[in-house]
Structures are given as structure tokens and as C-alpha cells.
């Protein structure tokens, strides 16, 4: 009978190595998987699978620490982070470490400490991974039943899910603790151009927090990506932290309901597919967040958003031409619309020119110049501060765009300056990885469903035409 994990279910392709290559004492004949299938050989060996996962965690943490130290070693304090291709230091700076007013780096030692701690942690994880992969028991069920499991044990699986949720909840609350009790976080909206600030009054109101989830993802609504203040971000982490903790406790103390037992496929590959689907969704959300949001991802560290760079260019030339004597309130552009200022369809005063498409941008360097009806003409004439001019000029020349023509009026010839914005890197990489993880989700979900239904889709090797053809030589 072809049971769920029987090697006979897989009809392996015959290769040169099938009978000869054995990795770690496990070959294709005994496991049903070739050497390159990696952890699939360990599906029913909980001890060895633990070793693989711990070692993998060690590799991840080692990358984080080593890359962190690499960025610290190459960091130039006089240049903005986004001009130096940094992707880790901006995250640490956003947490309020090592920075002061305006996002200026005043101390790199916390970044060094972070890198060293990660490298040391990776050594501990690496040792644990090697131990469990080579020395530790192959299965945990006999020696350590609390850590052992069988994939089909629905109650054990939801208990493991619950433990993960509790840990995630505490992780969310760590950010809350940093923001509220341990020195605060960097707030790009702090008066005068951003500063590290203790969040003393996080948002608890569920109508505000869950209102983001009920927003449209399109246009100016922006779903959760539209969050524009640190109080809501920290309040959201308070809510999600406790939801994860209480949800985790629920999954630990309860057994799956009948409808859940019927609805889900309960196998290792099914859990893999669920996880890949969840990570894919997180990747797509992260892509949008880092591309559009300048509160969670402050422009001082990650560079301006696309709309922000475009609006910054319009603002920079408005400042220049106003100094040269232009009347910014009445000057016409080549299309007959306002050259510097115009009205949006709903009546607000906005920047003119190509940047009109980004009229609903909100940025800390621009908001002080708004009035009750959009940009305030009198403020633009009298109240522009030097820091606003400097910042907009900097953002104008560091758009997160690579295009042969202009986008939103910003000159973006990619060969002109050796610069790629961290926003471009982070959003593109998360979109691409999110897509690949989604494909992997579909792949493993299809295999898991097929296995649960008692068949395996694939080529029937026994009647494959190539087997009846004469050898090439």
C-alpha cells in the first residue's frame, strides 16, 4: 500500500547518482528523495529537521550580523544613509539608536554592538544546528516528547502554532517597549525635521487601528500603508501583540474544531505551503509599505518616496524662481495651467507641473507650509525655512526611480549618477521574493492536496516514451 510517506509514491527519476550517492546515511532508496531535495529527506526525523532549522536560523543571523558590521565599517557620517546603499543601518536608526535631530548619526557604537551580538548569536545557533544534525537524536518523540510531533497530530500542530503566535506577540511588544520605555524611536514628524521621541500616548482606539484594515488599498486611501504617525504604529503593535499572544494561548489550550479538521490538509507539506503563502503576503505588503510610507520608513534614512522626490523638485524650483522674482501665485506654465501652483480637482492649492499627480503627498518638510485649503501662498512667500530647502533639494536629486524618461517631472536618467535608492532595493526585492514564495505556495499546496487525495500528479515513468528509445550512442 502506498502510504503517505512511502518511497514508492514518488516514482523517482533514475539518475547516475541514485544508487551510489548517500548523504548523511540517507539515500534516495530509503527516503524517497534525492540528495538535492534537502530537508524533504528529514520529513519524519524531527531531531534532524530541528538541526536543519536551527542551522538555517544561524545562517540568517550570521548574515544579519556580518552585513551589519560591513555597513558600519563602510559608513560615512557626512553622507546620508540612502546615498551609501545601506539597508540595515536605516532600520536601526529608525528604532532611535545612534541618531539625533534631523536623523543625523551621532554615534555608530550601537550599530557595532548590534552586529557583534548577531554574530555571537549565530555561533550559538550554528553549534546547536550542527549538534542536532549530527550528534543529537534522529527523532525527538521518544526522548523529548514535549518537542516531538507527528505531522498528522492536529492537536499538537495547533499547539505549535500557538507557541509561534505567542512568540510573535512578544516580538511586537518589544517594539512597543523600545518606543515607550527604552529611549523612544525616531519620528520623522517631530517638529523641525525629525527627532528621536518617546511615544507617551500610543493609539488604543480600535476604531482607528482597525479602521486602517477597512480602508481601500487604492488611491489616497492606502489601506494600512497609509499610516502617518508613530502613535498609530506603536498602538497597532500593542493591539497585534496582544492579539497574537491571546490567539496563541487559545490555540495551545484548545483542539481544532471539526470544521477546521475537515477544511485543512494536515501534513508537513501542507504546513509548508501555508507558511509560504503567509510569507508571500507579508512580502507584498512590505513592498508597498517601504515604497509608499515615509513614517515607518523615514526618508532621512531610506531616501524619499517617488512622489516625495517629485514634489521636492517642484518645491526646489519654486524657491529658486521666487528668489529670482517670479510671482509663484500667478505664473503660467506652457500648458496654461499654473507653473508653480494650481488647484486640484477638489480645490486644494497644489504644486503645478507634472508633479500634480502626486498632489496628495504628505511629508514632514512640506506639511508646515499647508493651510486649511492646501498649500498656503503666504507661508510659501514668507515662512520657508532653510532646513526645508536643503531637504527638498537633497530629495529631488535622490529619487527612488530608474527610468530613461522623467517620472513625475523628476530627471531619472539612471546612468547620470551612481545611485540606487534603498527604497528601490527593498521594495523590488520583497516583491520578487513575495512572488517566488507565492509560486512555491501553489506548488507545495498542490502536492499536499494531491497526496491527501491519494494520488500524485506527475509523469507516469513506467510508460514514458523515452524508456523505449535506443541509447544515443
Swiss-Prot record:
The keyword Secreted does not apply. Belongs to the PsbB/PsbC family. PsbC subfamily. One of its GO terms (molecular function) is chlorophyll binding. The chain crosses the membrane at residues 69-93, 134-155, 178-200, 255-275, 291-312, 447-471. Keywords: Acetylation, Chlorophyll, Chloroplast, Chromophore, Manganese, Membrane, Metal-binding, Phosphoprotein, Photosynthesis, Photosystem II, Plastid, Thylakoid, Transmembrane, Transmembrane helix. The keyword Transport does not apply. GO terms for cellular component: chloroplast thylakoid membrane; photosystem II. Binds multiple chlorophylls and provides some of the ligands for the Ca-4Mn-5O cluster of the oxygen-evolving complex. It may also provide a ligand for a Cl- that is required for oxygen evolution. PSII binds additional chlorophylls, carotenoids and specific lipids. [CaMn4O5] cluster binds at residue 367. It is a multi-pass membrane protein. PSII is composed of 1 copy each of membrane proteins PsbA, PsbB, PsbC, PsbD, PsbE, PsbF, PsbH, PsbI, PsbJ, PsbK, PsbL, PsbM, PsbT, PsbX, PsbY, PsbZ, Psb30/Ycf12, at least 3 peripheral proteins of the oxygen-evolving complex and a large number of cofactors. It forms dimeric complexes. This is Photosystem II CP43 reaction center protein. The modification N-acetylthreonine is found at residue 15. InterPro entries: PS_antenna-like, PS_II_antenna-like_sf, PSII_PsbC, PSII_PsbC_sf.
